[in-house]
Regions:
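Short, small/polar residue-rich loop motifs at catalytic or cofactor-binding pockets
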Residues: 29-32
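Single conserved hydrophobic/aromatic residue that forms the stacking wall/gate
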Residues: 136-145
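Zn2+-dependent cytidine deaminase-like catalytic core
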Residues: 37-134
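Secretory/periplasmic and organellar redox-cofactor proteins
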Residues: 2-6
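Conserved hydrophobic/aromatic pocket- or pore-lining residues that grip, position, or stack substrates
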Residues: 16, 34, 41
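Short, basic/aromatic recognition patches
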Residues: 9-26
Length: 145
């Protein structure tokens, strides 16, 4: 668990939060989730959970990167909610992140779903992906960029 947001982490997570807002009104009862992929200090893609049954934020960001000619391999993912690690309407986001070669995942908030809480981070770490969770910080901390 990390102790404080760096300036860049706050900036990228703020952008992920803004991306998450794009799903408002279309994903209930699921939460709003945003993801930004960053490589060499530059945003290469973003995604959000757009509608029920559609791509999750991480999956959309990976697709966005590839569609725009960027390889997500070696990127850092800034995700507003812990990546899911179970099959539902879509495959697990943890698998998508591993498949894409993401090197690090920064998570703003653990998933409140007891099926997922902590398991997504654990799976990523076991796969050799550096996963950082700011579980003790509140989301308003990110908004004050």
């Amino acid at each position: 668990m990390a102790t404080a947001w760096s300036t860049d982490e706050r900036k990228f997570m703020h952008r992920a939060l803004m991306a998450a807002e794009r799903g408002r009104g279309r994903v209930s009862p699921n939460p709003l989730v945003g993801c930004v992929l960053v490589k060499e200090g530059q945003v290469i893609a973003e995604g959000w959970h757009d509608h029920l049954g559609g791509l999750h934020a991480e999956q959309m960001a990976i697709h966005d990167a590839e569609t725009n000619g960027f390889s997500p391999n070696g990127a850092t993912a800034y995700v507003t909610l812990e990546p899911c690690n179970h099959f539902g309407r879509t495959p697990p986001c943890t698998e998508a992140l591993m498949w894409a070669g993401i090197k690090e995942v920064i998570v703003a908030h653990p998933d409140p779903n007891p099926t997922v809480r902590g398991a997504g981070i654990e799976v990523l770490e076991k796969a050799g992906i550096h996963a950082v969770s700011y579980t003790h910080l509140t989301l308003p901390t990110i908004y004050s960029v």
